[in-house]
Amino acid sequence: MYHNSSQKRHWTFASEEQLARLRADANRKFKCKAVANGKVLPNDPVFLEPHEEITLCKYYEKRLLEFCSVFKPAMPRSVVGTACMYFKRFYLNNSVMEYHPRIIMLTCAFLACKVDEFNVSSPQFVGNLRESPLGQEKTLEQILEYELLLIQQLNFHLIVHNPYRPFEGFLIDLKTRYPLLENPEILRKTADDFLNRVALTDAHLLYTPSQIALTAILSSASRAGITMESYLSESLMLKENRTSLSQLLDIMKSMRNLVKKYEPPRPEEVAALKQKLERCHSAELALNVVTKKRKGYEDDDYVSKKSKHEEVCSPKGSFM
């Protein structure tokens, strides 16, 4: 249960400001570590600023979702949600300048498959990468190298509570206890879209899975012109507890605002920041504390297979 979970105790935070402080601390700690090794000065332009790290994390998190969406065999939604949560948690306390998000995102997906018991072998997993067999083998070596690091940085808190199960639970509840809504399934598509958009934000680090699921359903109802206030007051028994109802409405409003204000990173900005990031991970600077095999760092192309049509129509290196 979520309320007794490590997710509630250790990975649900009070505010966006708290998340910003954690990320800024991770950025500062890495800079201090890099300066201490004598290769750079404190204000060296090679360093990424916290807001630049956030931009890169947004980009690679979207890449992670895209990788999972075309994965063969089809990856369950809970596995995708777990992988994304691992990625978010990892970069609360670590810098992209130390651990490259390209390999971390793959390690998150790989570990999520194991934890959520999605039966896929290591060769099957790397078979989804757009790489030669040798390249896939080397990438797997990297993933296995980083797997224990990832587990340690997650403080061994590997069970993730996603909003997808409570979402299905609310739909069942609407069907059985809320006759005013004749066909709750009409809410599913728009609610699913909301869940996809909220996954790109920090909502999973700020709100409970049931709050996210309920907000998705009520947002869908609102867009369809359906009023469901009576569901909150009658079916969820909040009529007599106006304080709890008011708090819930405030939470849902802030979550919708979080989704509304999310801005995907601009391609030109990402391109410039990726160049800056690669310099941090270059062999001559070697700012990253643990030097890894270089394969997998130089090129984004290996992250997902192309279709045969794409292989014919687009040159290597044009993926996303």
Swiss-Prot record:
Any single Gene Ontology cellular-component annotation: nucleus
Protein localization: Nucleus
SMART domains assigned to the protein according to its UniProt record, in alphabetical order: CYCLIN
List of residues that carry Phosphoserine: S5, S132, S304
Pfam families: Cyclin_C_2, Cyclin_N
PANTHER family from the UniProt entry: CYCLIN
Subunit structure: Associates primarily with CDK7 and MAT1 to form the CAK complex. CAK can further associate with the core-TFIIH to form the TFIIH basal transcription factor.
Family label: Belongs to the cyclin family. Cyclin C subfamily.
Stated name of the protein: Cyclin-H
Organism: Bos taurus
Protein encoded by which gene: CCNH
